[in-house]
Regions:
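"…together with the soluble PPM/PP2C metallo-phosphatase catalytic core" -> "…together
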Residues: 23-34, 41-54, 59, 112-139, ...
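Multi-pass membrane catalytic core of lipid/isoprenoid biosynthesis enzymes
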Residues: 28-35, 77-132, 162
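Topogenic membrane-insertion module of multi-pass membrane proteins
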Residues: 1-69, 249, 283
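Alpha-helical transmembrane segments of polytopic integral membrane proteins
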Residues: 43-46, 63, 101, 126-129, ...
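Hydrophobic alpha-helical transmembrane segments of polytopic
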Residues: 34-37, 57-64, 120-127, 155, ...
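C-terminal membrane-associated helical module and adjoining short loops/tails
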Residues: 1-19, 144-283
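Helix-coil boundary and interhelical linker segments in multi-pass alpha-helical membrane proteins
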Residues: 44-59, 99-119, 162-182, 228-233
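C-terminal ends of transmembrane helices
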Residues: 73-82, 129-144, 149, 195-204
């Protein structure tokens, strides 16, 4: 049995489409694999905390941050963004930056505060989930230049950074008897700041440039040296500064009379919705 040229071309086209479908499915696995890796790191951190290996537990959450920062970039680079990936990433973030840090800090030191300790850990986890839900609802409302409230990865870094700091013995001697109380304050601050309207710089407005100024290289090198010399202390201090920056910028806007970018975006969105509703009522 022989096939004519038209049939051969048709079979070739079908084969190419099937091959393209297989490639597409394999590429879609790539960004979700990073999301799964972030979730695995957080799960490992929980298991490590249950086994009193708090150093590994804290560092595991930072690995979750690393993988979480890569999945979206990989999806954009490979043009494989999907609604499934968005939802999976959000659910994984809830575990990685909400549940895991709350359990780790509770097992490490908040347990000593009794019921108050687990209540604080729960408030943190709840605030992280509320933060993620609000972020999903406000896509397209709030400018990408700012985060509305402290991002959940930064909050997790603040909480787990404190655990890491304490495990390595960098907490001052006079503060060590109050480790549980300090952890409670840090955890509550991180949780409540996530659901605040404080504007935090996202860094998404900076485009990739071909040339880098010398001062940027110098500052980057200095930061690398400082972090390398005392990783846990440097990371905790950096995230403390970032966690305070949103309130500082909000106060600056209030003091100078400039509009708060988050409040301005929300007001603009509400005005647009009211205008569209009014236009619909007219028609």
């Amino acid at each position: 049995m022989t096939t004519n040229p038209n049939q051969r071309e048709s079979l070739t086209a079908i084969s190419q489409r099937r091959l393209q479908a297989v490639k597409s499915k394999s590429i879609y696995v790539l960004p979700n694999a990073f999301t799964a890796a972030a979730l695995f790191s957080a799960f490992y951190g929980i298991i490590a905390a249950m086994n009193s290996d708090f150093l590994s537990a804290a560092i595991a959450v930072f690995f979750s941050m690393l993988f979480d920062g890569m999945d979206g970039r990989v999806a954009r680079l490979t043009h494989t963004q999907s609604e499934f990936g968005v939802q999976m990433d959000s659910l994984a973030d809830g575990v990685s930056f909400g549940i895991a840090p709350g359990l780790i800090v509770y097992e490490y030191t908040l347990k000593g505060l009794g019921k108050l300790g687990w209540a604080i850990a729960f408030v943190y986890a709840l605030c992280a989930l509320l933060r993620l839900a609000r972020f999903n609802c406000n896509v397209g409302v709030v400018s990408k230049n700012y985060f509305q409230g402290l991002p959940s990865p930064a909050a997790a870094a603040l909480v787990c950074g404190f655990v890491w700091l304490c495990v390595e013995g960098h907490l001052p001697d006079f503060a060590q008897p109050y480790t549980s109380e300090i952890a409670a304050v840090v955890t509550l601050y991180a949780g409540l700041t996530m659901v605040s309207n404080a504007p935090f710089f996202s860094g998404k407005s900076y485009a990739v440039v071909k040339t880098i100024p010398f001062w940027v290289i110098a500052v980057g090198t200095l930061l690398f040296i400082v972090i390398s010399s005392n990783t846990s202390l440097s990371i905790f201090v950096l995230f403390c500064l970032y966690a305070l920056s949103g309130y500082a910028y909000g106060f600056y806007c209030y003091w100078t009379g400039r509009p708060n970018p988050i409040q301005a975006d929300i007001a603009r969105s509400l005005a647009q919705q009211q205008a569209e509703q009014a236009e619909g009522d007219v028609h």
